[in-house]
Amino acid sequence: PYFHSKDQDFVLGVSLGVTIQAEEKTYSQEIIIPVVAIECKTYIERNMLDSCSGTASRIKSAMPYCIYIVASEYMKLKDELPELSNINEIYILCKASNSERLKNRKDNLDPHKIDEVLIIDLFNKIKGHLNSIWWQPSKALETGKIINRP
């Protein structure tokens, strides 16, 4: 059997041992079921966005409860539509464009600082996801909504 694996920069999940027995052969492998996956980039541009979007879709097809986040220092996007992807959020941690990064480097200036408020927001987003109750029938009857995603 084939187990597709994908390296992610950061994953929170559960490690499981999977054993498959067929035709007198036994296959065993450790797999990680992700609940949070974060891809880290120096900057995000269209090709990287497309790649991350595809990865987010594949992960969520196996684990719909997983949130997929891209944490990038700089942005190199123009008219792309990241909101149409399965990426839950893209953080631009320096709140600056890639061209600003390159200009600072060329001018021998310090790099942009990472915004600590965004780091706290990222932490709280993950904490909220991990602490959420994903399915509670009594709550659905109270709100009248079952999925209730933001």
What feature does the model see in each segment?
Residues 1-28:
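Active-site metal-binding core of divalent-cation-utilizing nuclease and nuclease-like domains
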Residues 3-8, 45-48, 115:
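Phosphate/oxyanion-binding active-site loops and adjacent basic polyanion-contact surfaces
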Residues 4, 32, 84-85:
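A short, structural micro-pattern
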Residues 10, 34-42, 52:
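Conserved catalytic cores of phosphodiester-cleaving nucleases, focusing on short active-site segments
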Residues 38-43, 70-74:
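Short His-Asn-centered micro-motif
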Residues 64-67, 72-150:
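C-terminal tail/extension regions appended to the core domain(s) of diverse proteins
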